Design a protein with these regions (language model features):
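Gly/Thr-rich phosphate-binding beta-strand-loop-beta motif of the actin/hexokinase/Hsp70
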Residues: 1-24, 98-118, 287, 291, ...
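Acidic, glycine/GT-rich loop-and beta-edge segments that sit at the periphery of enzyme/chaperone cores
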Residues: 110, 261-321
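Adenine-nucleotide phosphate-binding core of ATP-dependent small-molecule kinases
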Residues: 173-202
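Short glycine-rich, Thr/Ser-proximal phosphate-binding strand/loop in the N-terminal lobe
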Residues: 1-47, 121-122, 126-128, 313-315
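Glycine-rich phosphate-binding/hydrolytic loop that grips phosphoryl groups
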Residues: 89, 133-138, 245-274
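Glycine-rich phosphate-binding loops at beta-strand->alpha-helix junctions
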Residues: 64-67, 195, 208-234, 247-248
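Conserved phosphate-binding/catalytic loops in two-lobed NTP-binding clefts
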Residues: 78-84, 234-253
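Glycine-rich phosphate-binding loop plus the immediately following alpha-helix
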Residues: 34-37, 116-159, 261, 302-303, ...
Length: 321
């Protein structure tokens, strides 16, 4: 008995989890999609099928993230879920009564305040990556280091460089200046970790007092797998927080929990292995012409006749193709 989720963002990562009826993770994937999330998801699902015991089956499936609708149309995924709700479901499962959730991914950031079991407010930052994981990764690459190695070195910093929380352009200049002044790689790494945290707390969330976060705090997202960022957060806000061991999979895990909660015993509509082995997609373009926007639509046609339309700026173009 299994429920599966696929988180399909438009950035470089695709995540997936497979759980049993008790919510335990049986299988997970966290990796680059090389710019083709649909192909990545197909390979993940095929891998799941190949590893399932003979009598096991997929009970229900859920997709979330920016690629949700494409994956649903292409692969027959049962449900879609709003990404913030998926993250909340996972956080509540791990820390019942959670009051504050901060998720920092590779290119975006989201913060949720929870009161009495309901999401009270949501803050998002998708316009600038200066406070996200790709920001640190780029600096690590520039220094010829792996992000994991760069993060670990930051834990041994003696005098973290104060880099502020400005945009990447200014930060590049500040890092170069720090290097000229003799700052160590460890101090630069720790300084960047503090910058990520300060950007989240003081620019995105605009928090004035750490007490506003409550007592039950979860941090998640791939960026918090960086121990230096985790420690910088704890020192900045003056309290311990919970970082799940599945911090980079929380959206996928939460959506799998959604699939579990919606299981009606009728089985899943997720494409079987035979269909995935023969999967094809044909893309064409067409002008809508149903309103003054005159959108140039991209029409994706799948082998079973299903169509998925993008680039329409209103609902009138959704039925073409």
């Amino acid at each position: 008995y299994t429920n599966t989720n696929i988180k399909t963002p438009t950035n470089i990562k695709t995540k997936a989890t497979l759980i049993n009826k008790d919510g335990d993770i049986l299988y997970s994937h966290y990796g680059n999609n090389m710019g083709d999330p649909l192909k990545s998801v197909i390979e993940i699902v095929k891998d799941v099928y190949s590893k399932m015991p003979e009598k096991a089956y997929i009970a229900k499936s859920t997709a979330t993230g920016y690629g949700e609708h494409l994956i649903k149309a292409a692969l027959g995924v049962d449900f879609g879920e709003i990404e913030t709700m998926a993250h909340y479901k996972a956080a509540e499962k791990i820390l019942p009564g959670v009051e504050f959730i901060l998720d920092i991914g590779g290119q975006d950031m989201k913060c949720m305040r929870v009161k009495d079991g309901e999401i009270e407010s949501i803050l998002l930052n998708e316009a600038c990556s200066s406070g996200c994981g790709s920001f640190i990764q780029n600096f690590a690459n520039a220094l010829g280091m792996q992000p994991e190695e760069f993060a670990q070195i930051g834990l041994s910093a003696k005098s973290p460089v104060d880099l502020g929380s400005r945009c990447t352009v200014f930060m590049n200049s500040r890092v170069k200046q720090a290097q000229k002044e003799g700052a160590s790689v460890a101090d630069i790494s720790a300084g960047l970790s503090y910058s990520v945290v300060k950007n989240a707390l003081f620019k995105v969330i605009k928090i004035r007092d750490p007490k506003q976060m409550g007592e039950k705090i979860i941090v998640q997202g791939g960026t918090f797998l960086n121990n230096s960022v985790l420690r910088a957060f704890e020192l900045t806000c003056g309290r311990e927080v919970v970082r799940p061991d599945k911090a980079g999979l929380m959206g996928a895990y939460g959506s799998a929990l959604v699939a579990l909660s919606r299981d009606d015993g009728k089985g899943s509509t997720l494409a079987p292995l035979e269909k995935l082995e023969n999967f094809t997609i044909q893309k064409t373009t067409a002008r809508c012409g149903r309103c003054s926007n005159n959108c140039l639509l991209t029409i994706s046609k799948f082998a079973d006749g299903t169509r998925y339309i993008t680039n329409n700026r209103c609902e009138r173009g959704a039925g073409l193709g």
